[in-house]
Amino acid sequence: MRSAKLKFEKRRSRIRHKISKTSNRVRLSIFKSCRHIYAQIIDDSRSITIASASTLDEKITTLKKSYCNIDNAIKVGEAIAKKADSAGIKEVVFDRGGYKYHGVVKALADAAREKIKF
């Protein structure tokens, strides 16, 4: 039986392969740790990061022990959407990074979806 980490890595690579194969748009990539949430808009054709936002930004969060919650995910989603809008990006592909689409990931995606088309 495979370990949970190996299953997660396989799921992540399968999702990224499907995204890169089917689209020439930039992707909104999500990473979450136990304490923080990160979002990046990446152009794979040029291999550059266009915009990024996370709970490490002082404008987004206040002092707490853990920043990985739905309220902060909404703030990160709004921040990445604002940065994408200022960079002239109107359409992205959502890369959930192997995480289930619920909770923090869903909140971030819904907040970003208000300004960016998925």
Curated annotation (Swiss-Prot):
Keyword Ribosomal protein: yes
UniProt entry tagged with the keyword rRNA-binding: yes
Pfam families recorded: Ribosomal_L18p
Transmembrane segments: none
InterPro entries named among the record's database cross-references: Ribosomal_uL18_bac-type (IPR004389), Ribosomal_uL18_bac/euk (IPR005484)
GO biological process, one term: translation
GO molecular-function term, one example from the UniProt record: structural constituent of ribosome
Keywords: Ribonucleoprotein, Ribosomal protein, RNA-binding, rRNA-binding
GO cellular component, one term: cytosolic large ribosomal subunit
Similarity comment: family membership: Belongs to the universal ribosomal protein uL18 family.
Role played: This is one of the proteins that bind and probably mediate the attachment of the 5S RNA into the large ribosomal subunit, where it forms part of the central protuberance.
UniProt subunit comment: Part of the 50S ribosomal subunit; part of the 5S rRNA/L5/L18/L25 subcomplex. Contacts the 5S and 23S rRNAs.
PANTHER family in the record: 39S RIBOSOMAL PROTEIN L18, MITOCHONDRIAL, LARGE RIBOSOMAL SUBUNIT PROTEIN UL18M
Annotated protein name in UniProt: Large ribosomal subunit protein uL18
Lineage: Bacteria, Pseudomonadati, Pseudomonadota, Alphaproteobacteria, Rickettsiales
UniProt gene name: rplR
